[in-house]
Every structure is written in C-alpha cells, then in structure tokens.
Amino acid sequence: MNIHEYQGKAVLRSYGVSVPNGKVAFTVEEAVEAAKELGTDVCVEKAQIHAGGRGKAGGVKVAKNLDEVRTYAESILGTTLVTHQTGPEGKEVKRLLIEEGCDIKKEYYVGLVLDRATSQVVLMASEEGGTEIEEVAEKTPEKIFKEYIDPAVGLQGFQARRIAFNINIPKELVGQAVKFMMGLYRAFIEKDCSIAEINPLVTTGEGKVMALDAKLNFDSNALYRHKDILELRDLDEEDSKEIEASKYDLNYIPLDGNIGCMVNGAGLAMATMDIIKHYHGDPANFLDVGGGATAEKVTEAFKIILSDKNVKGIFVNIFGGIMKCDVIAEGVIEATKQVGLELPLVVRLEGTNVELGKKILNESGLNIVAAESMADGAQKIVSLVG
C-alpha cells in the first residue's frame, strides 16, 4: 500500500527523521493559510499523488510570496498530472503539500528495499540524488553503495557511517546522517515497509541533514497490525477495479490490451499473458482468482474484467488442483448468465474433475468455445478478437 509524501514524512518524523515543516492543503485558501502559518520567506508547493516525476510534470513549484502561493495552488489543484509513472491518463491533484523552503547544498539518495536474493533488507545510497535511481544504476552503477543488513541485529552504526563516507557526506554532518539512516531503518522495520525511499536527502546551508521527499510503501499482508497506517489509505489514488477485486480476494492488475484473462495461480496467469502475446494478442489484465474460487468469485471476476471497456474477448485458463474444474465451469456459466456476456469466451480446463467440467460447459447451451490446451485457447481467443 502506498501513502502520500506528507503522510510518509509524518511517519518518519515520529522516528526522529528530520523533514521540513509543512502542511497539507485541499483548497487554494488552505494553501495560502498554510503558507502564512509556516511564516517562511520561501515555500514549496508539491502536488500529492501516488507517482514520481511530479517536478518534471509541473507539480512542484517554489513560491516566494503569498500571491505566488495562491497562483500556483490555483494552477495545480484540480489539474491532471501526467508523469512517467501515471500512464497517459494521469492523476488528478486533490491535495497539496505546502512546505518551508531550505538552502540546499547537496542532494543524495538513500533507500531501503528487500533483497530477495539474500533475504535481507539492503540500504542503498548514492551522491547522485534528485534523479531516478534506476537511471543511476543503469549508467553509473559504481555510484550506488549498498549495505546488507542482518535481520538478527539490524542496521549497525558502522554500516550507516560507511554509507555516509562513501557518498561523501561532509564529515561534520556524518553523525546527523547516521542518526537519519538509523531512524529510517527503524521506521522501515516497525511499520512493515517494503520500500522506504528518500530522494533527495539533502544537506543544507544551516548544517542540517533532512528528507526533501519521502516514498513509503507498506506490505499489504501486514496492515492488519498497523491500523494507523491503514487509515492513511487514499482510495482515490487506486484503480477502482483493483479495489473491487480486493474485496473478493482477487488479484487484479489492469493492462492496456483487449483480451481479458481469468486464471488461477500467479505463475499460470503470467504464462497465459505470455502465450497471448506470442500469438500476437494483447492481454487486458492480470487476474488471479486463487486456489479457492467459488461461483461467486468467478462471477465477480467476470464483472471486473467487463468493466474495462477495452475488453473484446475473455480467455479463462484454469488448472484444477485444489480448485475443481466442475466448480469453475458452474461459475463460468453462472457469470455468463448474470452479466449477459456477448463477447467471445474461450475456456480451457485441466486437472481435477476436468471431464465433468467440460461436460457442464458443453451442456450449458451457451456460446462458449472450448480449448484443448493453453496454446489452443490463446490462438482461438486472438482469432475471435481479431
């Protein structure tokens, strides 16, 4: 689960991580009032959306007086920001972070992520802050320094100091930088984060080390023990179809194609998308109904797929292990009747009770195309969609 920058900074502040003073504003008047309360000569107005690249898209402005605060707030609030992370549809800006400006001397990058290869948290840092870390990793990987953290003992002071020296933090500020990284790590662990990214971390003319931006992503499976974090969820920033899918324990991710996919198991779902692409089709979604699908689940999955107006056909690809093929067949028939499906539907069943499942489909009287294999099903749906 993602949260907004201003929320992330509030979380970090509670762990002793230094961040600029700021206030969130939902209207132009609130933005002006927030700037007055901050009482600073220069303030920064930042669009609050769940996406990076806001500065390049015009979502970050520096205001030097209250008139500029008002002008920038009027120009940003209610507009749709399109960045490299939002997709072409962009995201509407419904809130601003009004933050005090600071005298930036140098920008750095600091982040914590899970490293699956070592099953450890890794602290990454670079003196190339303010730019996309992926870009730095691709062009100048030698500028990224890493410390792998033993989960039994946590981040050690010597590791944080080594990172600070490697990225050339001024020696008089190393102590502050170490405190910053230790606080960031505590927040990461105690709040069950999957990502904690500070880009940029800055040193200032006043001799401070602070986070000018904060991206925190939380493990959705751990939210049951973090009610305070769950309350920060902004449903307006999430895809409505993904929200609906989560209510039925369906894993749904929208894509840009026109062939809806309903599959059980993440691996089979990815293989299904691959084989559709292989036969020159374009999947419209990733949808994993899981191992315990019921007729109700299948019906809801159909409804979610069909809520995408780009979908021109559906491919159901089920391997019945825990799940029985006859249950899926009944669910497909029920869903087809309920939604009044008029689009081409190809169904491939394999596994437990497969013959019974096929019999149920064949005797349904509905226009359902049976497939003997995954490749056969992919070719048929691509052909039917045209």
UniProtKB/Swiss-Prot annotation:
<keyword id="KW-0479">Metal-binding</keyword>
<keyword id="KW-0436">Ligase</keyword>
<feature type="binding site">
    <location>
        <position position="102"/>
    </location>
    <ligand>
        <name>ATP</name>
    </ligand>
</feature>
<feature type="binding site">
    <location>
        <position position="264"/>
    </location>
    <ligand>
        <name>substrate</name>
    </ligand>
</feature>
<comment type="pathway">
    <text>Carbohydrate metabolism; tricarboxylic acid cycle; succinate from succinyl-CoA (ligase route): step 1/1.</text>
</comment>
<dbReference type="GO" id="GO:0006099">
    <property type="term" value="P:tricarboxylic acid cycle"/>
</dbReference>
<feature type="domain" description="ATP-grasp">
    <location>
        <begin position="9"/>
        <end position="244"/>
    </location>
</feature>
<feature type="binding site">
    <location>
        <position position="99"/>
    </location>
    <ligand>
        <name>ATP</name>
    </ligand>
</feature>
<keyword id="KW-0816">Tricarboxylic acid cycle</keyword>
<feature type="binding site">
    <location>
        <begin position="321"/>
        <end position="323"/>
    </location>
    <ligand>
        <name>substrate</name>
    </ligand>
</feature>
<dbReference type="GO" id="GO:0006104">
    <property type="term" value="P:succinyl-CoA metabolic process"/>
</dbReference>
<feature type="binding site">
    <location>
        <position position="46"/>
    </location>
    <ligand>
        <name>ATP</name>
    </ligand>
</feature>
<keyword id="KW-0067">ATP-binding</keyword>
<dbReference type="GO" id="GO:0000287">
    <property type="term" value="F:magnesium ion binding"/>
</dbReference>
<feature type="binding site">
    <location>
        <begin position="53"/>
        <end position="55"/>
    </location>
    <ligand>
        <name>ATP</name>
    </ligand>
</feature>
<dbReference type="InterPro" id="IPR005811">
    <property type="entry name" value="SUCC_ACL_C"/>
</dbReference>
<dbReference type="GO" id="GO:0042709">
    <property type="term" value="C:succinate-CoA ligase complex"/>
</dbReference>
<dbReference type="Pfam" id="PF08442">
    <property type="entry name" value="ATP-grasp_2"/>
</dbReference>
<feature type="binding site">
    <location>
        <position position="107"/>
    </location>
    <ligand>
        <name>ATP</name>
    </ligand>
</feature>
<dbReference type="InterPro" id="IPR016102">
    <property type="entry name" value="Succinyl-CoA_synth-like"/>
</dbReference>
<dbReference type="InterPro" id="IPR005809">
    <property type="entry name" value="Succ_CoA_ligase-like_bsu"/>
</dbReference>
<dbReference type="GO" id="GO:0004776">
    <property type="term" value="F:succinate-CoA ligase (GDP-forming) activity"/>
</dbReference>
<dbReference type="GO" id="GO:0005524">
    <property type="term" value="F:ATP binding"/>
</dbReference>
<comment type="subunit">
    <text>Heterotetramer of two alpha and two beta subunits.</text>
</comment>
<protein>
    <recommendedName>
        <fullName>Succinate--CoA ligase [ADP-forming] subunit beta</fullName>
        <ecNumber>6.2.1.5</ecNumber>
    </recommendedName>
</protein>
<dbReference type="InterPro" id="IPR013650">
    <property type="entry name" value="ATP-grasp_succ-CoA_synth-type"/>
</dbReference>
<feature type="binding site">
    <location>
        <position position="199"/>
    </location>
    <ligand>
        <name>Mg(2+)</name>
    </ligand>
</feature>
<comment type="function">
    <text>Succinyl-CoA synthetase functions in the citric acid cycle (TCA), coupling the hydrolysis of succinyl-CoA to the synthesis of either ATP or GTP and thus represents the only step of substrate-level phosphorylation in the TCA. The beta subunit provides nucleotide specificity of the enzyme and binds the substrate succinate, while the binding sites for coenzyme A and phosphate are found in the alpha subunit.</text>
</comment>
<dbReference type="GO" id="GO:0005829">
    <property type="term" value="C:cytosol"/>
</dbReference>
<dbReference type="GO" id="GO:0004775">
    <property type="term" value="F:succinate-CoA ligase (ADP-forming) activity"/>
</dbReference>
<keyword id="KW-0460">Magnesium</keyword>
<dbReference type="InterPro" id="IPR013815">
    <property type="entry name" value="ATP_grasp_subdomain_1"/>
</dbReference>
<dbReference type="Pfam" id="PF00549">
    <property type="entry name" value="Ligase_CoA"/>
</dbReference>
<feature type="binding site">
    <location>
        <position position="213"/>
    </location>
    <ligand>
        <name>Mg(2+)</name>
    </ligand>
</feature>
<comment type="similarity">
    <text>Belongs to the succinate/malate CoA ligase beta subunit family.</text>
</comment>
<dbReference type="InterPro" id="IPR011761">
    <property type="entry name" value="ATP-grasp"/>
</dbReference>
<keyword id="KW-0547">Nucleotide-binding</keyword>
